[in-house]
Amino acid sequence: MSNHIDRDVINALIAGHFADPFSVLGMHRTDAGLEVRALLPDATDVWVIEPKTGRKVGKLECLDSRGFFSGVLPRRKNAFRYQLAVTWHGQQNLIDDPYRFGPLLQDLDVWLLSEGTHLRPYETLGAHAATMDGVTGTRFSVWAPNARRVSVVGQFNYWDGRRHPMRFRKESGIWELFVPGAHNGQLYKFELIDAHGNLRVKADPYAFESQMRPESASLICDLPPKVEQPADRRAANQFDAPISIYEVHLGSWRRHTDNNFWLSYRELADQLVPYAKWMGFTHLELLPVNEHPFDGSWGYQPTGLYAPTRRFGTRDDFRYFINAAHAAGLNVILDWVPGHFPADDFALASFDGTSLYEHSDPREGYHQDWNTLIYNYGRREVSNYLVGNALYWIERFGIDALRVDAVASMIYRDYSRKAGEWIPNEYGGRENLEAIEFLRNTNRILGEQTPGAVTMAEESTDFAGVTRPPAGGGLGFWFKWNLGWMHDTLDYMKLDPVHRRYHHDKMTFGMLYNYTENFVLPLSHDEVVHGKKSILDRMPGDAWQKFANLRAYYGWLFAFPGKKLLFMGNEFAQGREWNHDVSLDWHLLEGGDNWHHGVQRLVRDLNHTYRHHKALHELDFDPYGFEWLVVDDHERSVFVFVRRDRAGNEIIVASNFTPVPRHDYRFGINQPGRWREALNTDSMHYHGSNQGNGGVVESDAIASHGREHSLSLTLPPLATIWLVREAQ
């Protein structure tokens, strides 16, 4: 019997409470020779085998009936490669001993991970297929600095935490182990004895695939190959490009009619992608696809940041969907949630028994609106985890843009909190300085590492410089959702037209701050839930007026400076609020031609016309690209403005937000000539009253509104028209 192993150590190993298994298990030099020790629960016979010859070189004695074996090889002085022939239940198995392999993490990786500057931590942490000393298997690593013991458990070891306790790298707080024979497709988790002695079983924070809820195990799989972003997709994200975004929740865009089940990623590739292309959108924005346990969160409470949800298929199926979108000429935007995470016990919450990823003080670490936990951005390993995740989706899946959710909740410590419910920053202010630095750092790194990919901020306050460079005090985003514009214009549109004259400024106010940020004009999922009604149902009047108002508003939206976003269903005027548990109301487009078809055709024409004319998108963020022609006609609720491209070509946009046609409506123009009606939301093609100007109107040498030439138009009721100057 070995004289080197204390009985207390054996007991601790078997009980799963020993933190340094490599100091005991494996091959060790002793005065008597090489000693091999193994913990093999339920084994009855163990031999040391020399792989080259298959010869038995020593038998291990059972020192504890619970599975601890040890044996001395007296003729051996130098460590050698060996295997173990283990008999379980009468059957012998030849295995490689995980405890004969050295440390896995390289010194540089350890240093970078500890410093929080490892750009791609997912290449090191988590589960990765590997071949070590000719043995194939999987190397596992997890950050849990305060755990007393960590084991990897899974289908390869009967989920038994005694079998594979991991090596602790004290300098980094990372636990690691190479498990021979563990292979792709197998399920696994990490079993921890936490800082307080409690047993916890956690999913891998870096898992590339996970089980679908309610199960929560991680899956071993290869790191996806890198995806390059070609020049055409980079160009499609630029400030002067036409950007029209179709925002989609994959689980409810369309469902199987027989069982209300989701479409798969591949079915969505075959149905959603060609539809979005046919409609003329340039970008698909996906509500979060990260793995999440609660359907009702719409993906905004993720537990698997690195894993596409299994609801719709495998990770490779998701890549197929992304590739299909790119092949159709659509860029893909992913909603990204670095602001908070749910408190589910299997995920990040109290990961090692301490507040590892979150703040310990609920005044900093608990989000009371959503019952979620807030990341501790000041902890380098946490910010590194998130920055690496942003790079992962762009580099490994070809995602073209990230839309960052709930930025305001990240950058303000008092967000949705009363006095006494939050802690000021070190200067006594309300700003979350660590979150601000995290966002700046993320945007800077993405700009350096993935040029052409962009980020968009959903930021609901007037924080200055969201889309300005960090060097100038900004956050470094490329685009910001203009929620103020959205609220103002919807507030205006819901009014009875007779009252709109008193709220004229709601439609013009956006231009007073238009050039402070690079704006996206969003009619998003948030505007069609929680009792807000659908966009159509917010419009006043009878059915005809509701549809006319909506069409006029869409005409205004697509002409106004800023990139465009419509949530699914808005493009055909769905009448009810969005419900994530069922399909959109596609039946509204069945049967004979109707008002919903009209709105759908209008949105398609708006998209294609918007993309065709540079004046409508080239100078969204340059004052030269916009000019009011009529801004003060509040009595008739009429607005007229010009959009302009770099070459000086103009498009005139005129909106009449009353049900009264305005005949002979004269206004001054900059460029005399013949103007063609490129789009009229009142056209019979869209189920309007078909009033207009016969397609073409000539300017007159009659002064108006301070200009020498003017146009006299018929402005249809509740309508927007676009006029394009024909070449002379």
Swiss-Prot record:
* Pfam (any one): GlgB_N
Q: Which one of the record's GO molecular function terms can you name?
A: cation binding
Q: Name one GO cellular component term.
A: cytosol
Chemical reaction(s) catalysed: Transfers a segment of a (1->4)-alpha-D-glucan chain to a primary hydroxy group in a similar glucan chain
* Keyword Glycosyltransferase in record: yes
List the SMART domains. Answer: Aamy (SM00642)
**Catalytic residues (UniProt):** 405 (nucleophile), 458 (proton donor)
Top-level enzyme category: transferase
> How does the record describe its quaternary structure?
Monomer.
HAMAP family the UniProt entry points to: GlgB
User: What is known about what this protein does?
Assistant: Catalyzes the formation of the alpha-1,6-glucosidic linkages in glycogen by scission of a 1,4-alpha-linked oligosaccharide from growing alpha-1,4-glucan chains and the subsequent attachment of the oligosaccharide to the alpha-1,6 position.
Q: Which family does it belong to?
A: Belongs to the glycosyl hydrolase 13 family. GlgB subfamily.
This protein's name: 1,4-alpha-glucan branching enzyme GlgB
Organism encoding this protein: Klebsiella pneumoniae subsp. pneumoniae (strain ATCC 700721 / MGH 78578)
Q: What is the lineage of its organism?
A: Bacteria, Pseudomonadati, Pseudomonadota, Gammaproteobacteria, Enterobacterales
